[in-house]
Structures are given as C-alpha cells and as structure tokens.
Amino acid sequence: MSRLQTRFAQLKQDNRAALVTFVTAGDPDYDASLEILKGLPAAGADVIELGMPFTDPMADGPAIQLANIRALQGGQTLAKTLRMVREFRAGDSDTPLVLMGYFNPIHHYGVERFVTEAKEAGVDGLIVVDLPPEHNEDLCHPAQAAGIDFIRLTTPTTGDERLPTVLEGSSGFVYYVSVAGVTGANAATLEHVEEAVARLRRHTDLPIGIGFGIRSAEHAAAVARLADGVVVGSALIERIAKAGDTARAVKDVLALCGELAEGVRNAR
C-alpha cells in the first residue's frame, strides 16, 4: 500500500478523519518553510500538501497568491521544492506528502525528469489544478506509472455525468472543493457538504477530503464528522503573512495546526 492508502486506512480504523494541511514551499523563506514542514506532523497534520509556487495561481485566493509571490521573490524554484521534500523525508518516512500546483512549472521542468525526481524525493501524490482528465497522458499516467497518486479536484459544479470522467484514474483520495471559486473563500454549509460527500460516495470508494474555507477547530471538527479528510490551507498561510518575522511564523502555523488537529480528533 502507498503511504496515502496506509494513512487513510489507519485513520478509518481509528474512526477519525485526516487533517490535511497545505503550505506553500518557500513561504516565508526556504529555511522557515522547511521548519514548518518538518514540524507539521508532530503538530497534528496527518497528510501534508506542499504548494509548488507559480506566477499565475489562478485557482487560489489572495492569501495563497501572496504566499506564491513571497516564495518566488525569495528564490523558490521547483528544484528547491523537490530538495525540500528530500530534506523532509530524511527525518519522516511515514507522513504522506502531496505536491499541489499548476502544470506550467512541471512542463518547463520536464515531465519525465519531474516524475523521476519527485518519486526519488518521496512525493506520494500530485494535485494539478489546471490539468483535466482529457490531458491524463500529460502527467497523470506518467505519475501513476511511477507510483505517485494523482488526486483529482471535484466541485459543486461537477455534474453527475461528468464525475465518472473526473474520477476515472484518480488515486490517493478525492479532493472536494466545497465552494466554487478561489481558495480561502467562504465556507460551504455543512448540509451542502454532507450532500456532496454522499453523492461522491456513490461514484468512488476513495477517501474524500473537503477543503476551501475551513478556518477554525470547530469548523474542522464539523467537517471531520462528514468526510475522510479536512483540508486547511489559507488559514495557515494567513498566519505566516501576519507573523512579522519567520520565527513567529513557524510558531503560529504549528500552533494553529495543533488547534485544528484537536478539533478533528475530537470530532467523532
């Protein structure tokens, strides 16, 4: 079993959801970002999504757009992001790590080179927001052939007739974007989330992670009662932006992760 399969299977046995945390590689700088990454599992993160900075993150809201800018201005590159994963893996062989971002930087890096180096670094999965199933040959198939899960996004506007196409070839887990729009937008109602999870379960046996708009331990707990994973990104990123210095940024992000983890673990 892959690290993602193992983690979700274990959590299912424990009757709780996964806390999935998103941070942008290189934000606020390389060293602090690596420190955050290394600290997340002990703070309570079950799965980590690491953003690959890009100049035009069109699906992301203001908080993550600014994180991309901070990271890129600090010199973060895709090669450095893969190095960061290797450094993380040197001390953690258990926590699943997923790279999330856009196809353009991967295309420029070279798909074959990227997939090979990502696998060697210890990447478990990919979420590429601007690569629909019609382009599976571009990255999904090469990644899965190398043993890297390819995680699809579904949204409130993904109809029943479209879902099988989106889910075909998906692996790892399904990421349900509970609000149509950019990341960090207002949270969806729990009733809406419950209906969406039920609809997705009719189409897939994969674990379902819910993201976009989750900001507090209470909200995380409420979503954790309905889904297999609770994805939090913008709320963590905002702590970095407000911190003022890197040491405070590390401390504040890990503190919020701890609060969210407590909410998720006490949910059921």
Swiss-Prot record:
Source organism superkingdom: Bacteria
Pathway: Amino-acid biosynthesis; L-tryptophan biosynthesis; L-tryptophan from chorismate: step 5/5
Residues at the active site: 49, 60
Keywords: Amino-acid biosynthesis, Aromatic amino acid biosynthesis, Lyase, Tryptophan biosynthesis
EC numbers for this chain: 4.2.1.20
GO cellular component, one term: cytosol
TM segment ranges: none
Reaction catalyzed: (1S,2R)-1-C-(indol-3-yl)glycerol 3-phosphate + L-serine = D-glyceraldehyde 3-phosphate + L-tryptophan + H2O
SUPFAM superfamilies in the record: Ribulose-phoshate binding barrel
Molecular function in Gene Ontology: tryptophan synthase activity
InterPro entries: Aldolase_TIM, RibuloseP-bd_barrel, Trp_synthase_alpha_AS, Trp_synthase_suA
Summary of subunit composition and partner proteins: Tetramer of two alpha and two beta chains.
Role this protein plays: The alpha subunit is responsible for the aldol cleavage of indoleglycerol phosphate to indole and glyceraldehyde 3-phosphate.
UniProt xrefs under HAMAP family: Trp_synth_alpha
UniProt-listed NCBIfam families: trpA
Family label: Belongs to the TrpA family.
Protein name as catalogued: Tryptophan synthase alpha chain
Gene: trpA
